[in-house]
Amino acid sequence: MRVRVSLFVLAFAFVFATSAAAQQPEKGYWRAASRTAESITGDISFSGSKITIDFTSFLISPLRLLTPAEVSAAFDEAVDTAGNGQLYRGNIPASRRFLKKNTLCGTQDTQWMAIYVADRSLKVAFFSGDNAPLMTFEALQGSTDLCGTYTFVR
């Protein structure tokens, strides 16, 4: 009986751990892979409700899932192969300087962050502005709120 209970607890823990990881694929440490990431943010990490950039943590809260069409528009991914992404709300002050004294959004506070994880790659787009970004190709092409896109790898 004790072995059966132990197996049940072990199976429950495994299912819980794998479902939590599947719900937050961005969680963990990511190395800068694009030129923008290497020159502005450096490596980043996600842990629960925080993003850490250049050894400074900022609170973020998930708002909604991004559809494959929105991921395609934001990160130039093929719609038929893109998965879901995530839109986060946060506040990274414009006064916060990162690598080489760079900021994320110039003189604007960073308010929004879209992410997309594919295999061992993480793509992040930072946005300023009071309203959530409209994640369509047309809106993003003319957006003054899109601060930049970054690529990271594990």
Which role does the model predict for each range below?
Residues 41-85, 123-135, 140-154:
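N-terminal glycine/threonine-rich, aromatic-flanked beta-hairpin/loop signature
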